[in-house]
Amino acid sequence: QKLCERPSGTWSGVCGNNNACKNQCINLEKARHGSCNYVFPAHKCICYFPC
């Protein structure tokens, strides 16, 4: 199943913790996965959803 990335709607500020971002994406936003990705000008928490 293909996953599409979307910036987290609940994360604010710079993303410095992959696990925290992943847990927040999964628990709060019902995503499949999440990680800190560099999006200019800083690292953001990106959630991955089924397309």
From Swiss-Prot:
Keyword field contains Disulfide bond: yes
InterPro entries in alphabetical order: Defensin_plant, Scorpion_toxin-like, Scorpion_toxin-like_sf
One BP term from GO: killing of cells of another organism
Keywords, comma-separated and alphabetical: Antimicrobial, Disulfide bond, Fungicide, Plant defense, Pyrrolidone carboxylic acid
Bilayer-crossing regions: none
Any coiled-coil regions, as ranges: none
Sequence positions bearing Pyrrolidone carboxylic acid: 1
Disulfide bonds: 4-51, 15-36, 21-45, 25-47
Gene3D superfamilies listed in its UniProt record: Knottin, scorpion toxin-like (3.30.30.10)
Keyword presence, Disulfide bond: yes
The protein's assembly and partners: Forms oligomers in its native state.
Function description: Possesses antifungal activity sensitive to inorganic cations.
Sequence similarity: Belongs to the DEFL family.
Name of the featured protein: Defensin-like protein 1
Organism: Sinapis alba
